[in-house]
Amino acid sequence: GLQIVESVGADIRFLVFNPKDPAAGKLAVRQAVAQLVNRDALVAKVYRGTAEPLYSMVPKGIAGHATSFFDTYGDPDVAKARELLSEAGITAPVKMTFWYTTDRYGSSTATEFAELKRQLEASGLFRITLRSAPWKSFQEGFNKGAYPVFGRGWFPDFPDPDNFVAPFVGPDSVTGTPYLSNEITRELLPSSRKESDRGAVSDQFKRAQDILVKDVRLLPLWQGKLYVAAGEDIGGGERALDPQTVMQMWELYRKTSW
């Protein structure tokens, strides 16, 4: 027989909000989107359980992972989202355009954004227009700041929380939309880089994630999963994969019976 061993991966997907956009630039609008997105439904309908809801930019399996967005927003709640907009004097429905790339992250991306549109519009608080482009022109567009809201994916160069925060914060953010946070770039990141024991930097990165939640410039959606298929006589599959997707073959062994 065959056994399937499942593990969390380090690839993530998230939304980026352009602060220069008339709608996406408003904190209450971003907070309302964060209050409405149903990650469980998203991964169930679109990815059939092969992805996992993500509530921070640092994914599960990486030191410093937290559930900051869930801790702040909890389950999707239309009433709370409506209140956020109302208190900010914003009239619903809010019109926004969401962009995604057609050829970078797989064919399910279009279905994913259709589901995001459905969720937001079902609240009655948003009217979402979807636009897409091939990766080359998509990349040119977000680097010019042309997109109000757009989807990005990320796979780290190395499995460290720094690689899930530093690239997105600062004047040269890889998202093409500068994100200035002096506390993160001048205090938390430099402090964490002095620590060789990466398991000891959780406090700095949890604080960084609290700041990311407060600003809602980035909205994490999901992280991928990894799978190993092996015969039932093979053990160690659960240790053979790490979040960097490096196959650690030495962890595999043939079971013996006595």
Question: Residue ranges of each PLM-predicted region?
Answer:
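Ligand/substrate-recognition segments at binding pockets and active sites
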Residues: 86-156
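Extracytoplasmic/secreted envelope proteins and their assembly/folding machinery
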Residues: 14, 30, 34, 39-43, ...
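Periplasmic-binding protein-like
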Residues: 2-16, 62, 170-187
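Structural transition elements
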Residues: 24, 53-87, 104-111
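A bilobed periplasmic-binding-protein/Venus flytrap-type ligand-binding module shared by bacterial periplasmic
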Residues: 7-32, 45, 189, 224
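Long beta-strand-rich cores associated with HINT superfamily self-processing modules
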Residues: 115, 228-258
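Extracytoplasmic/peripheral linker and loop segments enriched in polar/acidic and small residues
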Residues: 28, 43-44, 74, 122, ...
